[in-house]
Amino acid sequence: YRLTYYTPDYQVSDTDILAAFRMTPQPGVPAEECGAAVAAESSTGTWTTVWTDGLTQLDRYKGRCYDLEPVPGESNQYIAYVAYPIDLFEEGSVTNLLTSIVGNVFGFKALRALRLEDLRIPPAYIKTFWGPPHGIQVERDRLNKYGRPLLGCTIKPKLGLSAKNYGRAVYECLRGGLDFTKDDENVNSQSFMRWRDRFXXXSEAIYKAQSETGEVKGHYLNATAGNVEEMYKRAAFAAQLGVPIVMHDYLTGGFTANTSLSMYCRDNGLLLHIHRAMHAVIDRQRNHGIHFRVLAKTLRMSGGDHLHSGTVVGKLEGEREVTLGFVDLMRDPYVEKDRSRGIYFTQDWCGMGGTMPVASGGIHVWHMPALTEIFGDDACLQFGGGTLGHPWGNAPGAAANRVASEACVQARNEGRDLSREGGDVIREACKWSPE
């Protein structure tokens, strides 16, 4: 492999797709051989020389390991940079992209561990993807909500409620001041609550809350199903009801299904909320798997208006910077290389719409100053237990979140330092809102 696929003198082309792999070779295996093997097994190579190699232009189609750098503080671990010619990949297909780059190479026996840390998608390939159904700006225009983060809540308990009681919980949260409520990712169409009943009860709650508050409201109706035809049926029913948004579990559902649903949502005026159920199976190990920044990039290409991205509150500073790095990759039009934030390559999105990050998991009103400072306005903050756990009920819990959010945004706009004064801002808001 090394003689053919390790090319340290290679000059990267503007149209190459670049990958950064964290690579741990087996003891005794040279890093150059492993890097070349990764390039070979994820492009044109196989375990032996075959006579049909002579029937193709191998230099045109092969992947190349063009750089290796040791990982600081780790023994026998390297970042291998691999360049792939754009002609290896089908236009507009995240499925084909990932099948080629990570489909087989992770089982290669010369490697102890392998992790895909980042991808550089060139403009020539980015332009073959539709991206999010609508994007952040169109979503704000449809909701008529500007200048603050959007607020949401996952309805709990996530399993076991009847459709009628589920709709009641949705109504109380929306009436209290939230912009969205959410189906849990586990909720599809079980015996205790079939999807059509849930869609009907939740849409009734949306319209009732809208009429009382004068605001556009939404509920993430989970359209995930066992086959794409059934997903289309559920999304079509949501469109008939006139609700603004549906939801998909994109990793368990698959990228092909996600892209299909995204295109349907674009054509039928639905926003698409994406949950990342199963992501930790792929991205939790530091030395093996795929980093979430790659899953976030590929989701933006496949299509999604929202994507769960973690909270960063309470984590180490380094983790915070890495999380904010892939949050920027989700929503910004152009992101510069910045290794301190885990961004290995400069990424130009060529005008593709942004995906709004969703912060959820263990957050409540006292986190609001930090969340406002970290995420800014273009984010959706999801308070599950932080809403439904309020001692006075769902609507007061929602009101508490809304008041805290607006107080923090106003304080920030007035130039106050939320990192120092955030607690005071929340306590001042308590005087005007007993919730």
Swiss-Prot record:
Give the enzyme's EC designation: 4.1.1.39
Domain of life (superkingdom): Eukaryota
Q: In the record, what terms sit under GO molecular function?
A: magnesium ion binding; monooxygenase activity; ribulose-bisphosphate carboxylase activity
The family database entries (InterPro entries) matched by this protein are listed as:
RuBisCO, RuBisCo_large_chain_AS, RuBisCO_lsu_C, RuBisCO_lsu_C_sf, RuBisCO_lsu_fd_N, RuBisCO_lsu_N_sf, RuBisCO_lsuI
Q: Which residues form the active site?
A: K156, H275
Q: Give the record's keywords alphabetically.
A: Calvin cycle, Carbon dioxide fixation, Chloroplast, Lyase, Magnesium, Metal-binding, Monooxygenase, Oxidoreductase, Photorespiration, Photosynthesis, Plastid
Broad EC category = lyase
The UniProt subunit note reads as follows: Heterohexadecamer of 8 large chains and 8 small chains.
Protein name as catalogued: Ribulose bisphosphate carboxylase large chain
